[in-house]
Amino acid sequence: MPVLVVCLLIVLVSLIGGAVYGINKLIPTSKQMDLTEYYGQNADGEASLVAGTQKLEQKALISGDEVYIPLDVVNGYLNQRYYWDSANKKILYATPTSLTEEAASDQPGGNVWLKESTVYLKLDYVKKYTDIDSYIYKDPARIAIQYKFSNVQTVTVKKDTVIRYRGGIKSKILTKTAKDTVLRLMNEGEDWDQVATDDGYIGYIQKKKVSAADTTDYKRSFKAEAYSYFTMDEPVNLAWHQVTSTDANNYFADTTQNMTGVNVISPTWFSVSDNDGNVSSLASGEYVMQAHEKGLKVWGLVDNFSENMSTTTVLSNTAARQNLENQLVTYALKAGLDGINVDFESLSEDVGIHFLQFLRELSIQCHENNLVLSVDNPVPEDFTSHYDRAEQGKVVDYVIIMGYDEHYVGSDTGSVASLPWVEQGVKDT
């Protein structure tokens, strides 16, 4: 009999233990995630950074009530138009109508802080030209910045709940979230969705506690200065005219007498001649007058083909770059041109940001003087992404794709410009 009782007790204890274990598996943990562990350790004066739905390795700096964001974060996530002039230690910012500048200091207080070779921009300075929301917190110090407000995938919380570090009820809690809160949806799962809050938490929420995915356009009050464009009322049919000497201008009539369907001619008149940004010119006012009489617009072409200059050297040096811009506009106005066509080819990746700054600055001068600005580009490929045609399209009047050279001297035999290749180039632009 005692043996039977003992056995029954053992069975009972086992059943109770199993039940407790089973119940515990179903009870969500209420443990909170350590936020210092989550965001990472900061040195004195540093703050963790969240940009959109990403926790970043880079740190912000805090000085008193002011927050400073690393320039590479600003350029990479928020606004690429803050241009660092390293030689003169200042930030240039081109609006559609003016070029502004802010000198860097090795101390906080101003808009640009140069600390141990890293450039930081004051958050308020970034907000002056950029549509962002920022959330600043202590313990631990962190800054969350939201910058995407259109066509955002979202879910809405159906009742008060929590966001956890990982998917699963045993994962620690990151933060509470209230009914009707709109969360940014990162990934949909079977039972848990990965979401981000506007104030910088990135974690998981039970799928049954949020709505179906939706697309949200946030209402915004920020108004950026808009670019205006000089465009023609009809499609541009452009022909380049190779001019290698001033004497060649005298043959304009002969060259164009049988030309039909063209409304813009672009003579190859200008070339960057040295590393100071000086320009050699073959421009002719008489040529322009004859073209106008034939109903043609004239966009003078400038190239970077001279062996006596380095495109990187010219465009990365603000004095040389702006000398180039000034000379181009001066020559264009003197000859009575309607526009400038930039044909800078074989650009290396390291010159990409300087080329874009050149276009921004030249755009200001061209539009001040009623000149159309157009830019020639190779057909889009992965290795030419630094041309950044999307940014070009925002600051110039016409982005031109050179839809040829599919095959060339030294390549495999084939079409110069097959129709599918040209069509793909247009689609990819």
Model-derived segments and spans:
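Boundary/entry segment of secreted carbohydrate-active catalytic domains
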Residues: D160, Y201, Q206-A253
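SH3/SH3-like beta-barrel fold
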Residues: D180, W192-T197, I205
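Surface-exposed, active-site-proximal loop segments in enzymatic domains
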Residues: D274-S280, S306-A320, G410-G414
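Substrate-binding cleft of extracellular glycoside hydrolase catalytic domains
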Residues: M289-I340, F344-E345, H367-E368
